[in-house]
Structure formats: C-alpha cells, structure tokens
Regions:
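Juxtamembrane helix-loop-helix connectors linking adjacent transmembrane helices
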Residues: 19-89, 103-106, 270-282
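Membrane-helix interface linkers and caps
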Residues: 1-40, 55-57, 220-243
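Alpha-helical membrane-inserting segments
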Residues: 5, 9-13, 42-57, 144-148, ...
Length: 282
C-alpha cells in the first residue's frame, strides 16, 4: 500500500515544485566503502536507540511492540524480500527522498535539505523500530547526495544496507532457529539443553557470531571515521535566514499534514489496541 498509494501521491505533490540538482562529483571505490561503513554504524546505533525506546514502550503498556520489518522479512519468501527490499525499495526511496526532496529544498540550505530528507524518510517507515536509524541514515544519504549529486551512490549504499538488514540477518536468524531457542530458554532449560540446542544448529551459530563480530567491527570503525572526518561534514547555508528555516520548511501545511499522518501511523503501530477499542465501539 505504501508504494501503490502514498508514493505516487508524494511524487505528484513534490514534482510540482521547482528543483535544482546538486553539482555532480564522482567518488572512488574506497570512498564508497568508507561511506558504507559509516552508514552501517549509523544504522546499528539508530537500531539500538529504536530498540531501547520500543522496549520501554512495551514495558509500559504491558506487551511487546511489533517489529513490522522483521515480521515482514521473516514471514515472506526470500526471493520476494530480495526484490522488494534490496532492489525496488532503495531505487524508489532514493529517488523520492533524496532526488526529489533534496533538489527542491537545497536552496533553503544544505542542512535544511539533509534534515528534512532524513525526517521524511524516517517517518515514512511508519514504525518506531525503524524511525531512529532511518532518520539518521536518511540524513547521511542526503548529505552524500548533496555533496556528490550522484543518486547511484546513495542507491548503491541503500541496497547494501537493506541486503545486510533484510536478507543476511534474516537468513542467519532462520539458520539458528531463533524461535526454538526462545522456547528452550522460556521452558527453563538447563545449560546442557541449551548446549544441545546450539550444537544442533552449530553452523548457523558460527555464521551468526561472525555476523555479530562484523556488526561490532563496523560500528566501532564507523564511529572512528565520523570522528576523523567530522570537519568535512560541513553544509552550506541557503537563502533563508536562520530563524525562518523551520517555519518555512516544516511549518507549511503540506509538511504538517505529512508529519501528523505518519506520527499517527507510528502511534497506531505501537498501540494497535487503541484501534481495536475504537472500531469495537462503532
């Protein structure tokens, strides 16, 4: 539904605005790899924040918040997941949230365009689990687009990120039979039962541990890269005075409607019982 209804509407509205693409500047394969590591670091940091928030919300309301992405990825055919998450989504989302949005807002300042692109990208995911990392990742991809003018760079990075998050991680979770592990733990199994389970799926656990080590490595490396290159992460101001940027870009009717709609979707996703209660009283 997101791609069949919301995206065409968003494209139709945004394309009516005049835009100008950033100047093109090619990057080397080495720079692409460094950018990818930094993207992974942002994704994993954001994912930790999102998980923490949803865990707190779940504890307060007495039930876990559903992870929409993981539910979809683990419950879908892997070929369908690959085509949708790794091929289609990065192309469409980068075209809309980087090409269309940034081209039409960069005149207000590169910082404004980057934050707006990240905010809209984060909200568009429609759930709190993904908002934090999608917001951070969206801003960094917008920064790269502003500096390179190359959409193929951000599409390539987006594809790599989705491949790791929606394909590799899901395959590894299936390889270790996570549901069986949770069942073993919840049944109060002793250490021998846990060891028997892990030996049963030893190849999967080896792959999973390698993946965890990879996450830790890119997380630390990415943070170091951000520290090293922090002085290069500069954005040029735009035509609007500093005090008027928020009102001009965020405080307009279209953006207010967009934010209200997606915040409502996030709340509904976190508290589906509210919808059930309302519809049950109708």
């Amino acid at each position: 539904p997101l791609y069949l209804v919301d995206m065409p509407v968003l494209v139709a509205v945004v394309k009516r605005m005049p835009g100008e693409a950033p100047a093109k500047k090619s990057i080397t394969p080495g720079q692409f790899v460094l950018a990818l590591i930094m993207c992974f670091a942002l994704m994993y940091c954001g994912n930790l924040v999102g998980t923490l928030i949803t865990t707190v919300v779940g504890a307060l309301k007495g039930s876990a918040v559903d992870n929409a992405l993981m539910t979809y990825a683990t419950g879908s055919n892997m070929i369908v997941t690959f085509l949708y998450m790794v091929i289609c989504a990065p192309i469409l989302e980068e075209y809309i949230f980087r090409k269309l949005i940034v081209d039409r807002t960069v005149k207000y300042g590169q910082g404004v365009a980057v934050v707006l692109s990240g905010l809209m990208f984060g909200l568009f995911h429609g759930n709190l689990n993904q908002f934090a990392y999608a917001f951070l990742l969206g801003m960094f991809l917008a920064f790269l687009y502003v500096k390179t003018g190359e959409l193929k760079v951000t599409i390539g990075l987006h594809m790599c990120i989705n491949f790791m998050g929606a394909v590799v991680s899901v395959l590894l979770l299936k390889a270790i039979h996570l549901e069986e592990y949770q069942e073993v733990i919840m049944n109060g199994a002793d250490s021998q039962a846990v060891m028997d389970y892990m030996m049963k799926y030893l190849p999967g656990w080896i792959g999973y541990m390698i993946y965890v080590l990879f996450i830790l490595a890119v997380l630390v490396t990415g943070i170091v890269l951000f520290i090293v290159y922090r002085k290069k992460l500069k954005l040029e101001p735009g035509q609007i005075a500093k005090g008027r940027r928020f009102k001009t870009v965020i405080g307009n009717p279209g953006m207010i409607c967009y934010c209200v709609f997606w915040i409502a979707m996030i709340i509904i996703q976190m508290f589906p019982e509210i919808v059930t209660a309302i519809t049950g009283n109708l």
